[in-house]
Amino acid sequence: MDTSLAIALLGLAGSLLAAVVTYWLSKQKDLEAERRKEKLTYYKAFIESLNGIVEGDATPEGHLAFSRATNNLLLFAPQIVLAALNAFRSEISSSNAVNRTQEKHDALLAELLLAIRKDVGVLPVDERATFRPVLWTSGAPRNVT
């Protein structure tokens, strides 16, 4: 085989390989961005569902939305998020009404939100010692019929 032909074929093969690798890396980046976007959508739905279970604004529909949102997290959330979620759900469970405390609720909510924020890559990294999330109620009067 002629040397110049071999060099041309090697150049062609190298160019094709570079194009394939570039395409593959680009596709992987797109897929990861789509996964991140979907994960954020589920996390937002979970945070929004907290509104339906906050004392003073809680409704049966809110509890159903919370249940659905937390169950959806089982699809993709890392184990640290699921462990924090399970601890939080146990604390707020109706079967734990006698032992429930605001302090434990707040601490478990903070742990859960810290795990979620870490999973989505919130920067700068939160300071665990000072992270104190507070859920707000609407304060709107409820229509009682």
Language model feature labels by segment:
Residues 6, 17-145:
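Conserved non-transmembrane functional hotspots
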Residues 1-12:
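Feature marks short, highly hydrophobic, charge-poor N-terminal signal-anchor/signal peptide-like helices
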